[in-house]
Amino acid sequence: NQWLHVLGVASDDACQPFATSYDAYCAASSVVEPECGAEDDDMLYIMYTSGTTGLPKGVVHTHTTAMWGVFTIHATADYQSGERYIACLPMFHVGALTPLTINAYHGATTYVMRSFDPVAAWECVQREKITSGLMVPAMLNFMVQVPNFENYDWSSVRSFMTGAAPVPVALTQRYQEMGIDITQVYGLTETCGPACLMDTENSVRKPESCGKPF
């Protein structure tokens, strides 16, 4: 049997018996940076496309392409300090992995759902004071179909990004009435995520647009 090494963010005396506190883990480490044998253009991972326009294929991404995806979104999207992001998409999809990397770079807090459930999503939004996230249009639609969803507190949410399918204007307007901006993004596995992004200012004026190319 193989056991996963668990790190706890609590103090030594508050950690569970099966976990090592983060402070103790760091204290046992060397202050000298280890040598890194990886180069910028070395392969980082292979991610498979969804097969929307053909058979799924493996896309090779390097450290450089992954970081440029991060830099592009970070420079153009409406990221703010103290961001609290809900991650609903599966981690094998570029629409989930790239935002996770962006949040780590930005210093944002990411709440990862094991699987999408609209009720659990609303509970997370309310409990963790979520400010943003990325969902496909169907997820956004499921969210407002939850019975009595109006009873949840979503006042912390500033905006949700969406993509992978056309977004009905009525759905965008529904969220705008709730005080939540819906901004469309268009991306590809081949571009490590971003290709086009609509800014929040124009998302109301042009709700059917996914914005300008980067």
Give the ranges of each region predicted by the language model.
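Conserved AMP-binding/adenylation subdomain of ANL enzymes
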Residues: 67-84, 92-132, 145-146
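Gly/Ser/Thr-rich phosphate-binding loop
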Residues: 105, 122, 130-135, 144-205
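Conserved pre-ATP/AMP-binding loop-to-beta segment of ANL
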Residues: 13, 26-48, 55, 78-84, ...
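Short beta-strand->loop structural element characteristic of the AMP-binding/adenylate-forming
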Residues: 1, 57-60, 87, 109-115, ...
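Beta-strand->loop->alpha-helix junctions that form or flank phosphate-binding loops
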Residues: 5-13, 183-190, 210-213
